């Protein structure tokens, strides 16, 4: 277990992804005053190794589950993988209910009849179906069947957990810190963070990371995620520019402005590629057709982790296409259950 104190009373635990798709995840713990509650920001991967590391960290800090609050920034497997386990141990979990507005999301795995039904509708909307793309459709269905047969949940699969709904502006106080909940839309629709104005420190989940362009994970049309992401980054640059930014992946960031500039530049560059792919001829294209052109996808990945990466590519392309449509740079048409994007 690797743990260090990154600010007075705030500890960081570094966890590693055995599936290697994410690499590492950083969980943060704000230790409460004697006899008071402590806070954990996210839980890490849903693996035995991560559980052992987190339990060792809690023992080292002398924090019991019954005195532990857990703030989930968003509902992705690397951030809430242990939430169901910790809830069973009497930890109290907080999350924005907007993270569950849909039963299926392209960037996480969840079993259940409702989720499977919605998945098929989403896949159809981006141009993936048994009729149009039989090999890719079969791969999605095989993965669902494989997950259903596992005795233990796959690390990407999110187990259900009880939680208390949190709202923007709500205050969480632990130790000498008073955090208020901030909206961080973009990476997901309902992602939230924590900000202490006095100590100038903010937990910002996957909104910004140094050297990495976060995925803006569009799964459903008309959610305006990339536009909301740009608005959020602008707010962060203006209001949190002098803060210590604590992301869920990578080192804390002392000067966030250049990191934000690089992320915006990366997305503008990707949107140029997406727009070029869509308007190169007169034929409107689905999200999947555009993704193949932009990323040069020739074969359907057989490896599970590579398949997850491909899903992220589809989601990012979807975000760019929706933003281009909102800015009236491409046309969008919906027919036969599919979205098509083309020249104005």
Predicted regions and their residues:
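A short catalytic or substrate-binding loop motif that flags glycine-/basic-rich loops and adjacent residues
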Residues: 20-22, 164-166, 185-188
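C-terminal regulatory/interaction regions
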Residues: 276-344
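Histidine-centered divalent metal-coordination motifs
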Residues: 71-79, 187, 191, 249, ...
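Conserved beta-strand hairpin/beta-sheet module of binuclear metal-dependent hydrolase folds
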Residues: 3-61, 108, 193-210
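Metallo-beta-lactamase
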Residues: 40, 45-48, 154-158, 178-271
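Short Pro/Gly-enriched beta-strand edge/turn motifs at strand-loop
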Residues: 7-15, 148-155, 175-177
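Active-site HxH/HxHxD metal-binding segment of metal-dependent hydrolases
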Residues: 49-50, 57-172
């Amino acid at each position: 277990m690797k743990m260090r104190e990154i600010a007075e009373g705030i500890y960081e635990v570094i966890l590693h992804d055995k599936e290697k798709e994410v690499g590492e995840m950083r969980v943060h713990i704000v230790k409460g005053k004697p006899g008071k509650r402590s806070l954990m920001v996210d839980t890490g991967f849903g693996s035995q190794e991560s559980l052992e590391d987190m339990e060792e960290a809690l023992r080292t800090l002398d924090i019991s589950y019954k005195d532990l609050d857990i703030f989930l920034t968003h509902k992705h497997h690397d951030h809430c993988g242990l939430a169901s386990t910790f809830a069973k141990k009497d930890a109290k979990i907080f999350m924005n209910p907007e993270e569950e507005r849909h039963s299926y999301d392209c960037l996480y795995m969840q079993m259940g009849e409702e989720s499977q039904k919605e998945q098929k509708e989403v896949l159809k909307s981006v141009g993936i179906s048994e009729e149009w793309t039989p090999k890719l459709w079969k791969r999605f269905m095989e993965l669902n069947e494989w997950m259903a047969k596992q005795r233990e949940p796959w690390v990407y699969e999110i187990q259900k957990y009880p939680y208390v709904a949190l709202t923007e502006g709500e205050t969480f106080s632990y130790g000498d810190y008073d955090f208020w909940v901030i909206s961080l839309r973009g990476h997901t629709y309902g992602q939230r963070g924590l900000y202490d104005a006095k100590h100038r420190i903010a937990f910002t989940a996957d909104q910004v990371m140094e050297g990495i362009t976060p995925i803006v994970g569009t799964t459903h049309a008309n959610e305006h995620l990339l536009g909301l992401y740009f608005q959020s980054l602008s707010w962060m640059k203006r209001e949190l520019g002098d803060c210590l930014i604590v992301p869920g992946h990578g080192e804390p960031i002392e000067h966030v402005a250049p990191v934000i500039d690089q992320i915006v530049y990366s997305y503008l560059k990707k949107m140029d590629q997406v727009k070029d792919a869509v308007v190169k001829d007169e034929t409107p294209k689905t999200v999947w057709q555009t993704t193949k052109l932009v990323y040069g996808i020739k074969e359907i990945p057989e490896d599970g982790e590579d398949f997850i990466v491909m899903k992220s590519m589809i989601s990012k392309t979807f975000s760019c296409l929706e933003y281009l449509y909102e800015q009236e740079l491409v046309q969008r048409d919906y027919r036969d259950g599919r979205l098509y994007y083309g020249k104005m």
